[in-house]
Amino acid sequence: MRPPVKPPSKEKFIAKKFITLSEFLDEYVQLYGLNHWGASYLSNNRHRIEHYIKPYIGSVLLRDLTTHDLDIFYNQLLEEPAVILKGHKRTDRTVSPSVIEKVHGLLRSALNQAVAWEYIARNPAQYASIPEYTPGERAIWSEEDAASAIQLCDDPILRSAMLLAIGGSLRIGEVLGLTWDCVDLSDPAQPQIKIDKELERLKKEDLEDLKRRDRSKVKFEFPNWKKTPSTTVLVLKAPKTESSKRRIYLAPTVGKALADVKAAQEQAKALCGDGYTDYGLVIAHDTGRPYEERQIAEKLKAFIQEAGLPPVVFHSLRHFSTTLKLQISNGDIKAVQGDTGHAQARMVTDRYAHITDESRQHLAQQMEKDFFHRSTAPASPVSTSQDADMQALLPLLQKNPDIVKLLIATMK
């Protein structure tokens, strides 16, 4: 016989009744976050909790938190100084609306869980108002600018990284995490790469927490080359989603650049001898060590300034690549999705299909040529058009009499 369910203890009920938002968020991360979030998302959410939520409303009792409290909190954040991450330049900027939007999303998710756990009856974040803002569009190069960048860049590392981002529609972590065992240059006319990992720097605390839950996607941890202990670790990890694992066909120009990089690495190995550590990385220092995202970003920024090109960030190259492929393929979203690794085709069109001024101008010109030119031109005699059609159709009917039967059948 099933034993009776024990009612919750009085102590537990009292604890639930007087739990603060800060205490609840700690529990939320442990019971929910560590079972659902990846390392980067876990790190970002912990940062938002510690720096943007707890200092302001962490002491509020969970049961007392209202929608009005959250509206006041979000407006207060607009006037607070933004938190400066370690290694970043100090600025006088206040918390941006985009950060507040992310904080709100985190609180809404957490408070939904509070409802599920019966801490509260309703979610006060459901009807809270966040400051409105229009996200700025990410600047991308035109085809002419991108072509100039490839031609002008004489840094083999940066050029190869740009070619992979543009030719393969890769994210920066996928570019830096690409290894030679995933590169196939056996057919120079059709080089291929396989994306099954990415390079990323993670907080050791977050990584260890996920390891204890057997949820770490890390394939390899690089050693710490600093002379002092570090709270972070550079890793090669599996992509966030299964759809990000993919095979990509590259243009021969990209394959040729990769072959040149491989040859240069072999020379570096010979020169460095034991000083070269071979991690198998395509984008690597002369000692074999990996490049990090900020190092490539610095290279790109310096090159853009020197070349006089419009300023863009490295991720803009992926945007440019996706847009260009959509245009070249006449909107073959599935083919482009295969390169970008998006889980859903809609994400390609919603996030990356930026219609440039050139394509919009071309569209207007095509409308003039294909539609308006005919609609405003003098009308031709119908009989002339019909005669021309019959002249074109006659040889086809002579070669294939079955078409005559089909035409007769459609007239009935």
Positions of PLM-derived features:
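Basic/aromatic DNA-contact patch characteristic of tyrosine site-specific recombinases
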Residues: 1-19, 23-30, 34, 40-43, ...
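N-terminal DNA-binding module of tyrosine recombinases/phage integrases
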Residues: 1-72, 261-278, 357, 372-385
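N-terminal core-binding DNA-recognition domain of tyrosine site-specific recombinases/integrases
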Residues: 17-117, 135, 289-295, 310-316
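Basic, Lys/Arg- and aromatic-enriched nucleic-acid-binding interface segment
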Residues: 83-87, 91-97, 101-103, 116, ...
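C-terminal catalytic core of tyrosine-transesterase DNA break-rejoin enzymes
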Residues: 116, 163, 167, 174, ...
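Catalytic-site neighborhood detector that most strongly recognizes the C-terminal catalytic loop/helix
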Residues: 132-134, 140, 197-201, 340-366, ...
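Short, polar N-cap/turn motifs at the start of nucleic acid-interacting alpha helices
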Residues: 182-192, 311, 330-353
